[in-house]
Amino acid sequence: MSSVKVAVRVRPFNSREIGRESKCIIEMTGATTAITNPKVPPNTSEAVKRFNFDYSYWSHDPRDSDFSTQTMVYKDIGEEMLQHSFDGYNVCIFAYGQTGAGKSYTMMGRQEEQQEGIIPMICQDLFTRIHDTETDELKYSVEVSYMEIYCERVRDLLNPKNKGNLRVREHPLLGPYVEDLSKLAVTDYQDIHDLIDEGNKARTVAATNMNETSSRSHAVFTIFFTQRRHDTMTDLTTEKVSKISLVDLAGSERADSTGAKGTRLKEGANINKSLTTLGKVISALAEVASKKKHNKKADFIPYRDSALTWLLRENLGGNSKTAMIAAISPADINYDETLSTLRYADRAKQIVCKAVVNEDANAKLIRELKEEIQKLRDLLKAEGIEVQEEDELNKSTTGIKSPSKSRNRNGSTTEMAVDQLQASEKLIAELNETWEEKLKRTEEIRLQREAVFAEMGVAVKEDGITVGVFSPKKTPHLVNLNEDPNLSECLLYYIKDGLTRLGTHEANVPQDIQLSGSHILKEHCTFENRNSTVTLLPHKDAIIFVNGRQLVEPEVLKTGSRVILGKNHVFRFTNPEQARELREKITENEAENEVEKADAPQVDWNFAQCELLEKQGIDLKAEMKKRLDNLEEQYKREKMQADQQFEEQRKTYEARIDALQKQVEEQSMTMSMYSSYSPEDFHQEEDVYNNPMYESCWTAREAGLAAWAFRKWRYHQFTSLRDDLWGNAIFLKEANAISVELKKKVQFQFTLLTDTLYSPLPPELASSVAPLQQEDEFGAPPVSKTLVAVEVTDTKNGATHYWSLEKLRQRLELMREMYHNEAEMSPTSPDYNVESLTGGDPFYDRFPWFRMVGRSFIYLSNLLYPVPLVHKVAIVNERGDVRGYLRIAVQPVLDEESIDFNNGVKQSARLVFNEDDAKPKYRALNEKDDVQRYIDNGGHDSKLEELEDVDSGRGIDSNSASDCPENAEEPGEHLQVGKEFTFRVTVLQATGIGAEYADIFCQFNFLHRHEEAFSTEPVKNSASGAPLGFYHVQNITVPVTKSFIEYLKTQPIMFKIFGHYQTHPLHKDAKQDFVSRPPPRRMLPPSIPISQPVRSPKFGPLPCPPSSTVLAKHDVLVWFEICELAPNGEYVPSVVEHSDDLPCRGLFLLHQGIQRRIRITIVHEPTPEVKWKDINELVVGRIRNTPESSDEQDEDACVLSLGLFPGEVLDVPGDDRSFYRFEAAWDSSLHNSALLNRVSQGGETIYITLSAYLELENCARPAIVTKDLSMVIYGRDARTGPRSLKHLFSGQYRNPEANRLSGVYELSLRRASEAGSPGVQRRQRRVLDTSSTYVRGEENLHGWRPRGDSLIFDHQWELEKLTRLEEVGRMRHLLLLRERLGMDTNPNPTTKTEKDVCNLAARAATSPVHMVIPQSPQTPVKDPQQIMPEREYNQREQDLMLKCLKLVQAGRYAKNEANDTQTQSDVSPSDEGCADMTVSCISSNSMEDNKFVIRRRLCSPDRADAPNGWEAPAPATQPALPLRLYVPELEEIRVSPVVARKGLLNVLEHGGSGWKKRWVTVRRPYVFIYRSEKDPVERAVLNLATAQVECSEDQAAMVKIPNTFSVVTKHRGYLLQTLGDKEVHDWLYAINPLLAGQIKSRLARRTLEPASQTASQIQASSAANANSANK
């Protein structure tokens, strides 16, 4: 193996660099090349970068003593590579660098002596050595090929037949090769020289026709060198085949430095693609070579990404001896390109090639190709295609005769086989070709090539060879000029006597000179040669320039004239006779001056182009000056705008600072005002206790409720946890970034820890929560606090640690110090693993060998009754996931017992319980009143209801409570205080433990005795699924004390299971990434957060919402419409595509460039508190193409305040709800957003956020309606129909009222409070979220972010799982003990119907609606006579009772000041009239329970024809609404995606004219009413949280309509009828599961009573028959 030899060569300054007075930034000393950064101060460390190569050639100044010539470069590199080729190795030399760096000069050189490049010199030296060493035993043969790779297309430069692009293929034996690439045999250097010359001509013709440049294409010249040595003794001939690849790469430059545009830019992109791929290959090979150990999976090298690297695959890291010459520029203006070239060359040094001698390659290759051809023939025969035999190959070009049948199912396989067969036959035919045949084919191709040149008009010599640099002595001629100097003066066209026509090959008259390309006509022009005078005759519409002037009329050409034909063909005209005459007419001195004058400017392609621009009136210097002036003016203008914008921002920030300063001063004044009070101004503590006014007359139940509420809110710490997460996120990101950069393999992430039985805190973290571990003033046991910690995942050692936030900050200081010292460490520094084991590295901590699997708990209350129990308890980890099960036996050891243990381990111990041990460290999780602070999702009152139920004696069965074993007052005789008691704990088996753990053992102890633990022996975990048998017996003797008896009653024993990982230290098992039960939906946050209001330019940033008490809440339905201007001049709502799968549940389909308006309609129940006064502002902003948005977008200029039209109150016939509508003109172009100005691209959705600031009466602030809208913009004339077939066939888009989007909002009214109090300011504190703040090295984290609010929800679910597991374990123990004691002797077992009712109740209890829907009031009545005697009431008594009831209700609502103006009736009159419908507001169990039912009237109270002869009482006078200031809050409700029930119902609304069929959807806690199934817009909303659902026999008998139930809100009532009998229960269960369960339970009891009566009668009759038979 050998590495790639790399040489660097620097060229002299060119004219461009000299004109710009560039400085040399390259220095070479020996093999070291140094480059100086001109943009960095010279004395800094980054100013000079040094690189070491195999060779460094200084070719900058020929006057220097160390100047490197072409010969020196060849002797160092060319001769060595040529020797490798004679040794039988493959050889490759390629030049790399930017355009104009000297690559072509190094590889090809010039025609002058001592200026030849590597390619000509290596070819000349090759034949010199061949002629010197060739003998009869040793013969040589040389073949060459010349190809060009331009824009990933391969062209053959030696064979004119191959006009198209050649195909690059890959053969399993040959590797990548170019199909049909001609290989021509050569016998001497002159043959190679002629082929190179003719190849360059073909390259010139193609480049001129296609307007290409050779510097933008790759040229690959390949020499196939074969040595045949004949051994006379053995009469065997051996071969060595070498392939010499000489590559001239295209220039590597950046688009901005070359000024490339249009086609040139695309060409550069394609060329840079191949060069970029070459760079990737070099980098990948260098990385592979630098690795110490290879991975099992082969490293991927992207050879196939470009044709260049695919063809050079063997030369890059394969079977080849390779050399790279990096050509660089010395000028400072090319610093970036030069540095990039040096870095590529430095990477190429590390590439290792595995070159082998290619001996006898053809014989083996021919044999393997024959085998492959035979396999392909067999495959084609199997497909039914006849193929010719091997002896017929010479008669046919392909081996396929004709297919015997048409294309079958395996057509693709057949075509592939035919293609492979043809390619293999071509290869074997090429390999079997003799040397004489190759020479003959080479001669044929030469003749074809010369004929093609002659046909094109290119001059040829008398022997047929094309004229190269040869200049005729008599005949006028044209010589080509090319942008690439190497391709200039390669083509010569004779102008014969008479007429010489020039055009394309498509002309009707054959043209003498044929050109092709753009702007060349079929008959372009004619040259007339009369008496050595050449006249150019242009044809019509032909583009011709002579000396820069466009030619319209015939003109006589003078020698040296520049002729431009079309746009790309540039020539120089030369007339030898005319030049000779001019020299004879003038004197010698004048001739010398003329010659000097002619020689002064070099007539080349650049000269012709500049001349063309000048003659056309384009002054390059003036144009450049003008462009510079424009750039300078643009710079000044942009700088002025930037300064103006900066000044505006400065003023804005200064205004903010002044406002904050003013706020701070006001707060300080307020605090100083409070501090000015003296202690005498406040009430003394003894005054409060002595003054009767301060005494509270609470009952015991009220004091318990107050203590429960106090503890709940005392430990409610969601906000403080979030503040800790937000404030320390930046430290976590910095630690992770440093860990990645230092390759520590340690990850940091936030976690929440709570000190519970299953998850005790580590000692260092437990100290931080010690102050909370004490009883409060109500005597409650201590409760653990949840704290934020850092989970440290050590993937290197397979360990997990927990750090406090303080420890993270301390370790972070050490990490920063290590990061800064990393650059000073040498590569020979010891491995960090040593430091991680010794604790010297701040990233690592010491870790134990055994890891915790989980914990289990066993209660000991069975020892109070000396009975043994065998428990099967779950092994639970700290996350609340079950990791296995443990079987444990607990039994008392009495004096008369004596058990012999044959197997297992038996141990004894003695413990002493002190009186201090009676108080447990942990407060049990099943004490729900305190743990509920973690698992309470919102302010639900379920715990309060439980407490009330317990207080009233209905929560727990009295019989079960009295029979509970734990309620035993006195222990048995075996537990006498002062005596000793012995009990036995037997650890039997463990099951279900994962296979990742080995050597499992169990350790158990009492909760307060961690230092006195009992341990079993480790057991091997075979992972076969069999139980792990411990069989460990532990006898424990304890002196009986009161604390020990109390412990037996209330506390368990803790069992810890340990094990170590099988695959240590891989961390994939250490993380315990197993599938756990997901949390319920109610524990999760909404999927897409609702956007915050867009900041109003008029109101500015709104203050924080007040924390005062909510006085009233109202449900508001809002409709959003975007209207577009129709041809009739009206604004018509645009089409809306409705779908629950869309983020906004609706998509507006808009047209581009049409005037729009936004229309918003607000619908709600009429109430005195909510009266819309006016619309103040409508703001639209946050234009984006993702559903998520951020408040930072409010700072952009996209926020726009729309022009408003006056709002109006609508009067909808048949609907007495309040409708308020307003519109605003929306000119979307003012946002200056490309998303709104152009037509949306395919699959693109645009999102905006709008906020409407509305003014309400009696409100100090505006109410804000905020909504996210999604839209797609089509063309102006496009049809905006629905995009899905479902909406297309439903036809709902044709309904104009369906083209709106609805939103459900909750309007909360709070009392305006003073914001200056310290308590309010403390509650309004805001902690900056630092998770988005940038830290150094953040880009290495690949988008990782610290966890935030979701972590709190996940921890809630973990605590709830732990709570459930402990409750289940405790209850299982009690049930097992009851069964063991024989207490479960219930004579009436639970029936199937009762079980169904229990299941219904359980399911309802876990649903969110259970938390918010109050049950219908139940009145437990055992004897109706004891409450109210049966009697009939007259009309006056009934009216009096109704009046008292309403007064009581008014007094109840009077507590909420916003509702004290409630009218006598809770509903408003309707315009359509009222139906005679009443429903019961108090549910009754049966008609026999209550003879009199108080009814709520759903119709208007002033209606004369009241039902049942009742007379409506006179309406009470409406009190005047006092002027109060409220603070409104409008919050959008994220409707649940879960549909509990949907279908058609008959709906009778109060005040309605009759029954109407409506489509009803239940999404708890809301019921949505639609007009029909196809109606996508919600027309009405019912909030089940504030409604009562009634379904009773009294109601059915009253309305005399079957299958009905009612939903009554505080504003109106609905009577609903299902379409079938069986649907009533399903609808009730969807709306109120608890009510459905009660009804089903009631029906079940009724069905059981007749059955029990029948059974008793049968038993009585059978007993009577038995008695009579005995008698």
From Swiss-Prot:
Query: Matching PROSITE patterns, A to Z?
Result: KINESIN_MOTOR_1, KINESIN_MOTOR_2, PH_DOMAIN
Q: Where is the PH domain?
A: 1538-1636
Which part of the chain is the FHA domain? 500-566
* GN (gene name): unc-104
What function does the entry list? Required for presynaptic maturation, has a role in axonal transport of dense-core vesicles carrying synaptic vesicle precursors, components required for the morphological transformation of axonal growth cones to mature boutons.
Give the Gene Ontology MF terms in alphabetical order: ATP binding; microtubule binding; microtubule motor activity
Please name the GO terms of the biological process aspect recorded for this protein, alphabetically: synaptic vesicle transport; vesicle transport along microtubule
Q: Which organism is it from?
A: Drosophila pseudoobscura pseudoobscura (Fruit fly)
User: How does the record describe its quaternary structure?
Assistant: Monomer.
Recorded protein name is: Kinesin-like protein unc-104
- Give the family this protein belongs to, as stated in its UniProt record: Belongs to the TRAFAC class myosin-kinesin ATPase superfamily. Kinesin family. Unc-104 subfamily.
Q: Report keywords, A-Z.
A: ATP-binding, Coiled coil, Cytoplasm, Cytoskeleton, Microtubule, Motor protein, Nucleotide-binding
